[in-house]
From Swiss-Prot:
Part of the 50S ribosomal subunit; part of the 5S rRNA/L5/L18/L25 subcomplex. Contacts the 5S and 23S rRNAs. Belongs to the universal ribosomal protein uL18 family. This is Large ribosomal subunit protein uL18. GO terms for cellular component: cytosolic large ribosomal subunit. HAMAP family: Ribosomal_uL18_B. InterPro entries: Ribosomal_uL18_bac-type, Ribosomal_uL18_bac/euk. This is one of the proteins that bind and probably mediate the attachment of the 5S RNA into the large ribosomal subunit, where it forms part of the central protuberance. It comes from the Bacteria. One of its GO terms (biological process) is translation. Transmembrane segments: none annotated. Pfam families: Ribosomal_L18p. SUPFAM superfamilies: Translational machinery components. GO terms for molecular function: 5S rRNA binding; structural constituent of ribosome.
Length: 124
């Protein structure tokens, strides 16, 4: 087994451990984060119904075509994605969430998304 596969396997084990303990509800959905090598994705999920309320990612046109973000590093884009999902959540009437780091270390871009969401007005 390669080192990359081992890292992913360990991340998936961490993710399963976390998901056993937390779940999103309609009043307090789960803010789920996924981080790829190039992009970051965030979504608000109600686990009782299996419904996604709001999504935001660095791969969508609102972020890609934003002239303020050209030349910014991935962490700065992640903060913007956090603010974007917070704004969309406010539009849906959601103010409080449960944070799901998805097995990723709470550091770097994952932390940047949560900081941006907090700045945008979401309570964790």
């Amino acid at each position: 087994m390669g080192a990359a596969n081992k890292k992913q396997e360990l991340r998936l084990k961490r993710k399963a451990r976390i998901r056993k303990k937390i779940a999103g509800t309609p009043e307090r959905p789960r803010l789920s984060i996924f981080r790829s090598a190039r992009h970051i994705y965030a979504q608000l999920i109600d686990d009782t119904k299996g419904v996604t309320f709001v999504t935001a990612s660095s791969n969508e046109p609102d972020v890609k075509n934003n002239t303020e973000l050209s030349g910014k590093n991935k962490s700065e884009v992640a903060v913007f994605v956090g603010k974007l999902i917070a704004g969309r959540a406010k539009d849906k009437g959601i103010s409080s969430v449960v944070f799901d780091r998805g097995g990723f270390v709470y550091h770097g871009r994952v932390k940047a998304v949560s900081d941006g969401a907090r700045e945008g007005g979401l309570n964790f």
